[in-house]
A protein has these predicted regions:
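Extracytoplasmic
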Residues: 22-49, 67
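Small-residue-rich transmembrane alpha-helices and their cytosolic helix-loop interfaces
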Residues: 24, 56, 60, 87, ...
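Residue-level signature of mid-helix packing/kink "hotspots" within the transmembrane helices
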Residues: 32, 60-68, 152-153
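Interfacial helix-cap and linker-helix signal at transmembrane-aqueous boundaries
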Residues: 41-42, 73-74, 158-164
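Conserved MFS/SLC helix-loop-helix module at the cytosolic interface between two early adjacent transmembrane helices
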Residues: 65-101
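Helix-loop-helix hairpin linking two adjacent transmembrane segments in secondary transporters
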Residues: 103-105, 143-164
């Protein structure tokens, strides 16, 4: 048997690879939008400029909680269903952040956004790896991870443009 006959005949379509990369980038971007907006958030919520760093702290605590508690669920339950639930929860968290009237509501929303944005990102990368055939996993995971880096950087640029 030749090596070529052992390989699957259909590669993951480029559009699917781009979808994983884009979704990963958009998911992680939610975790980083607030950083350039801290001065505006301090003014809008009447928080001191020293205390507004709690927004980033809450988001990063959410990231850590996701890695410890939520991401491992992808090995135990159906990954597609888990990601669908996480997506709905992330949308709810983002809506709660956008409608926050108090600093405590903002912090809780950012904690949830950090947790769900991180969990979605990691889940998408793992799902991309499992959906790709063995010979293209590196390319697919690399594209998804590239989407993460691009989303992280562009989120800060976009939010920085809004804050100016």
């Amino acid at each position: 048997m030749s090596l070529t006959s052992a390989l699957p005949s259909a590669d993951m379509p480029r559009s699917m690879v781009w979808l994983f990369a884009t979704a990963s980038g958009l998911s992680v971007a939610n975790v980083y939008y607030a950083q350039p907006l801290l001065d505006a958030l301090a003014n809008d919520f009447g928080i001191s400029h020293a205390a507004v760093g709690g927004v980033v702290t809450a988001t990063q605590i959410g990231c850590a909680l996701a890695l410890l508690l939520v991401v491992p669920l992808g090995d135990k339950v159906d990954r597609r269903r888990l990601m669908a639930v996480q997506l709905i929860a992330l949308v709810v968290a983002l809506v709660s952040v956008s409608m926050a009237q108090s600093s405590s509501a903002l912090l809780i929303g950012m904690l949830a956004t950090g947790m769900l944005g991180t969990a979605m990102t990691q889940g998408l990368i793992a799902y991309a790896a499992s959906a790709a055939s063995a010979h293209e996993q590196g390319r697919v995971v690399g594209a998804a991870q590239g989407g993460v880096f691009t989303g992280l950087l562009l989120a800060r640029v976009f939010a920085g443009g809004i804050s100016d």
